[in-house]
Amino acid sequence: MAPKQLRIGTRASQLALWQANWVKGELEKRYPGMAVELVKIKTMGDKILDVPLAQVGGKGLFVKEIEEAMLRGEIDIAVHSMKDVPTEFPEGLGLYCITEREDPRDAVISRGVKFADLPQGARIGTSALRRQAQILKVRPDLQMVVIRGNVETRIRKLTDENLDAVILAAAGLNRLGFADQVSEYLPVELSLPAIGQGALGIECRLDDETIKDTIAFFNHPDTAHAVRAERALLWRCEGGCQVPIAAHGQVSGDTLTLTGFVASVDGTRSVKDTISGPVTECEKLGIALAEKLLADGAHEILAEVYQREVAREKEIPV
């Protein structure tokens, strides 16, 4: 039986609140009479806005404080953008649901110019190293400008910082009603998305059977399989915000196709490959693709980016 009250932990950004309110609305529709409360929590990633994420370092910049609140019993579930969720969780917590994915692509907002027609040396604003690496791979003449802040702030920087274009995740723009400002959607072949891009994750205490039963309906199996494969690849590559790693999985029937990409920050060296297999083996596929990328040159690229060796072998947790 569903609880009478449920507390959702969320960041206080415009997009995070949209996502948490969407979950709240779906819960209230399914369980009339349930009192759902949003608990806003400020994370380290929200506090440090003047430094690129890659330089802040560490993992879980947008989730750690929320998880701590859950461990203290102050919230029942947490709603995250899947691309912000680390591959490992504090003991007792876990990712129980992954929602149906929104548009996973990256979107360009420019001054009416298509990406292919951007002038030589154009200034492009983005927050993600994987975008930067992939864009520079095809257009090494472009100047990449690191932008931070919420979606609206980043769009405003097009004018405020005299940029020629900004690149953001399409999902966030769609959710917040900014789709009409998009000049162009970049195909995944050009800009492979971040791990989990477009999907939401719902985290809870793994021993709370009532909450798990209550939220189970949010899980979208095809998206969950695809995202778990992407996350397995990231886990094997020991990835975080400070490295250009991208992956995108797609499910068709019983088959999962996963593409992965690892690059140097300037895009001059990169390795990309695709693997297919049974959807039931999603995490094994992610690790197998990661092993292939590492063997084909990603190991050396990552060792340079991390300034340390990447494990030649990694034991899969039971």
UniProtKB/Swiss-Prot annotation:
InterPro entries: HemC (IPR000860), Porphobilin_deaminase_cofac_BS (IPR022419), Porphobilin_deaminase_N (IPR022417), Porphobilinogen_deaminase_C (IPR022418), Porphobilinogen_deaminase_C_sf (IPR036803). Pathway: Porphyrin-containing compound metabolism; protoporphyrin-IX biosynthesis; coproporphyrinogen-III from 5-aminolevulinate: step 2/4. Binds 1 dipyrromethane group covalently. Keywords: Porphyrin biosynthesis, Transferase. The keyword Transferase applies. GO terms for cellular component: cytoplasm. Its cofactor is dipyrromethane. The porphobilinogen subunits are added to the dipyrromethane group. This is Porphobilinogen deaminase.
